[in-house]
A protein has these predicted regions:
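Conduit-forming functional cores of very large proteins
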Residues: 1-565
Length: 565
């Protein structure tokens, strides 16, 4: 017991003794304190009540009107109110170290569940819906007050703490493939696309249609199969499967044509059919899914506005992230067939195997307590109260295990599913609430060989959405320098990035950048003119850009050339 100031738990039991009496001016309290050595100290003392007579009369009138009895004058703040909303959803947080509670509360926000009951009708930009969310067996009182149980964000997993062939080292987890096939942790990702008939000056406008079916000529038409899944109005058929991952070219989501980009393109527009551009909307690169809903409405300027939702099934796979409510996060390292998974004497096969090394150094005792509590709750068909400071105690949970024929330690004898031999050591197993987080490997997987570059720096674009290159940073460069792999450095940082042949004037030490004049078909130095001694130098375009930016500041950088030896 800690009697100091700032303690989270009130060590005293307070009893009001004279509340039923009339015209009380002071309250008599009986305070009982249980000391750590087991002895109880009892004291009685009085407190003056800061009530005016009118307040007491008002309370008495309320008593008569509501037929209630005034049983208290003061309310003590509950101990769990020192926690925030997310932290109060974590069971037994007082048994964890502070960083783990903080990490657990951060991941509660990332868990998948049911974001809204009308998600089929809401055109949100992105939505992620778990198929079968469950209420947690071990919960807290805050779950009722926050209505978390009406829209939960996870599922109850049968978990065993053991390693298997090293596939769950470094926080990875091993998952039962049969559980995944029975829709454990399965979710759907929904993305909304917006297409609009934009209007331009001069009466020109975009048209949502199947390109190439009208009277106008269309530049940049795709193959006929690319538009085969579109209806006559240019919109896709619901429940049509679209993909950018396979060879079939069916990534067109909305067929659309636009007027010529520049007026020069509209040559002969009055003499012949107008020429238009193909500007269909495609689904995002690297994604696939089914057309879920198509909403057609009007935009603010009375144009046609279309909103299409795409639905993608997200089945747990290698690399997907799962986490308990105690900051124990990890990605799937292996999916194991049901017949190869370990099983208990009762034939229970765990859904998840986590590594024993994840527990001791992190001191997440609440993770272990919740596994025991989930085991008792699932056997006795009741919920376990894991509210901070006042939840069901460990002794009660151990007694519940004994009542149901289990070892009070939570450990069980398990058999190797691959060899049929019983493990020499007992394995700790239980039921715990796990969350699937929205960090999915399918939405992060990215590779590139060749692709587009930026206009300014002529280096590869950045980011998965723009099909960008993978950054070769300073530390990677330093590794190659330490290896002495100079040709690899040149290949990565120059040839495969922004290599550039720069023309440099060497006429009497000029050192300025020259250029090639296509009209006169000769190299020209802006300082020396046509009759200049120009040489090609291989460098990066970023260096050439630096020289140009220095010129804009009024600083002329001159390059000195030497013969290569």
């Amino acid at each position: 017991m800690s009697p100091e100031h700032g303690r989270p738990i009130n060590p005293a039991k307070v009893e009001w003794m004279n509340l039923g009496e009339e015209e009380i001016s002071e309250a008599k309290l009986r305070v009982e304190v249980q000391l750590s050595n087991g002895t109880a100290v009892v004291e009685e003392f009085s407190l003056p009540l800061n009530y005016h007579q009118e307040d007491v009369d008002a309370l008495k009138k309320k008593e008569k009107k509501d037929h209630t009895i005034l049983v208290y004058t003061h309310v003590e703040i509950d101990t769990q109110l020192i926690l925030g909303v997310c932290a109060s959803l974590v069971p037994y947080p007082e048994h964890n170290s502070t960083p783990r509670v903080t990490g657990g509360t951060a991941m509660v926000k990332q868990s998948l569940g049911l974001p809204s009951s009308n998600y089929r009708l809401r055109p949100d930009t992105r939505a992620h819906v778990m198929h079968y969310p469950q209420q947690s067996i071990v919960g807290t009182r805050a779950m009722e007050s926050t209505n978390f149980n009406t829209r939960p964000g996870g599922q109850n997993f049968v978990v065993a703490i053991m390693s298997q062939h090293g596939y769950n080292m470094q926080d990875a987890v091993i998952m039962n493939r049969a559980s995944v096939e029975r829709a454990l942790g399965r979710s759907a990702f929904i993305r909304t696309y917006n297409a609009e008939n934009k209007r331009f000056p001069g009466g020109q406008e975009e048209r949502i249609e199947v390109p190439g079916t009208g009277l106008d000529e269309v530049k940049g038409l795709k193959s006929f199969d690319s538009y085969s899944h579109l209806e006559r109005d240019g919109l896709p058929i619901p429940e049509e499967f679209l993909s950018t991952l396979d060879k079939s070219d069916n990534s067109v989501l909305v067929g659309k044509t636009s007027p010529p980009r520049f007026l020069e393109e509209a040559h002969g527009a009055f003499l012949q059919a107008q020429e238009r551009r193909e500007s269909s909307m495609l689904i995002r690169h690297g994604e696939e899914g089914w057309v879920d809903n198509v909403f057609v409405t009007e935009s603010l300027d009375s144009g046609r506005l279309v909103r299409i939702t795409m639905r993608t099934n997200k089945i747990p796979e290698l690399g997907d992230k799962f986490a308990s409510r105690h900051g124990q996060k990890g990605v799937i390292g292996r999916l194991v067939d049901e017949k190869d998974m370990p099983f208990t004497e009762d034939g229970v096969i765990p859904d998840l195997l986590i590594n024993p090394h994840a527990i001791p150094s992190r001191m997440t005792v609440a993770h272990v307590l919740e596994m025991i509590g989930g085991k008792v709750g699932s056997m006795e068909a009741r919920k376990i109260d894991g509210t901070a400071f006042t939840g069901e105690k460990e002794d009660s949970l151990r007694a519940g295990l004994l009542r149901n024929g289990f070892n009070h330690t939570g450990r069980e004898s398990m058999t190797n599913g691959e060899t049929g031999e019983e493990y020499t050591a007992e394995v700790f197993a239980g039921v715990i609430y796990y969350q699937r987080l929205h960090h999915l490997v399918s939405s992060k997987l990215h590779a590139r060989s060749r692709g587009r570059v930026q206009i300014l720096t002529r280096q590869p674009t950045e980011g998965r959405a723009r099909q960008g290159g993978l950054r070769f940073g300073e530390m990677e460069r330093d590794c190659l320098i330490s290896h002495g792999a100079s040709m690899v450095i040149k290949d990565r940082l120059l040839d495969e990035s922004d290599g550039w042949e720069m023309m440099v004037c060497n006429t009497s030490g000029c050192g300025h950048i020259a250029y090639y004049d296509w009209k006169r078909r000769t190299t020209v130095c802006p300082n020396c003119g046509e009759r200049s001694d120009v040489h090609k130098v291989q460098t990066s375009y970023a260096f050439k850009l630096l020289l140009d930016e220095m010129k804009s500041l009024g600083v002329a950088m001159r390059l000195e050339l030497e013969d290569r030896r």
